[in-house]
Amino acid sequence: MSRYTGPSWKQSRRLGFSLTGTGKELARRNYVPGQHGPNNRSKLSEYGLQLAEKQKLRFSYGLSEKQFRNLFVQATKVKGGTLGFNFMILLERRLDNVVYRLGLATTRRQARQFVNHGHILVDGKRVDIPSYRVEVGQVISVREKSAKVPAILEAVEATIGRPAFVSFDAEKLEGSLTRLPERDEINPEINEALVVEFYNKML
């Protein structure tokens, strides 16, 4: 299954969950798209609930099903902690996500584009792989030639507050993951246990 590239508001309304984190797309129409949207939310089966929760998390990070499933498999090999939380941590450590958390992009999709286009450095070296796994303490910065890209500057200007697990210097356009996040600091609306149940049946 390929990565979804359509409007995020449609997916948000279909899932009843804000994929952008702002909630704006649900403010006026908190129902699925289509003519019968308001009356089209039926009660989900156990499998349906698990699938919906998996889709919420997958679309939030903008991954294809293959990427998402492969990362889950990697999480099963992490020692200590719960499988669901370990999976969430691996999602958070993706370079595109850290760029988004630092406020260098307004969305994860935009952050992925910045990484793909070579605008982002890790410890001074250009990394153009969105799935690159960031370590605590690594310095994420904007390449000198990209420091005046309007979209990056606008994102930094528009960012109000950043998670407690990152640090950021707006003048230098650089920051880092200072520690791994706690569970209540990332996607508290997601029930990752349902995602684990879904994949335990599939794998």
From Swiss-Prot:
Source domain of life: Bacteria
GO cellular component: small ribosomal subunit
CDD domains tied to this protein: S4
Domain S4 RNA-binding: 93-156
Molecular function GO terms recorded: rRNA binding; structural constituent of ribosome
SUPFAM superfamilies: Alpha-L RNA-binding motif
Keyword Translocase: no
Gene Ontology terms describing biological process: ribosomal small subunit biogenesis; translation
InterPro entries in alphabetical order: Ribosomal_uS4, Ribosomal_uS4_bac-type, Ribosomal_uS4_CS, Ribosomal_uS4_N, S4_RNA-bd, S4_RNA-bd_sf
Keywords assigned: Ribonucleoprotein, Ribosomal protein, RNA-binding, rRNA-binding
Pfam families: Ribosomal_S4 (PF00163), S4 (PF01479)
Task of the protein: One of the primary rRNA binding proteins, it binds directly to 16S rRNA where it nucleates assembly of the body of the 30S subunit. With S5 and S12 plays an important role in translational accuracy.
Family: Belongs to the universal ribosomal protein uS4 family.
Subunit-level organization: Part of the 30S ribosomal subunit. Contacts protein S5. The interaction surface between S4 and S5 is involved in control of translational fidelity.
Protein name, UniProt field: Small ribosomal subunit protein uS4
Organism in which the protein naturally occurs: Streptococcus thermophilus (strain ATCC BAA-250 / LMG 18311)
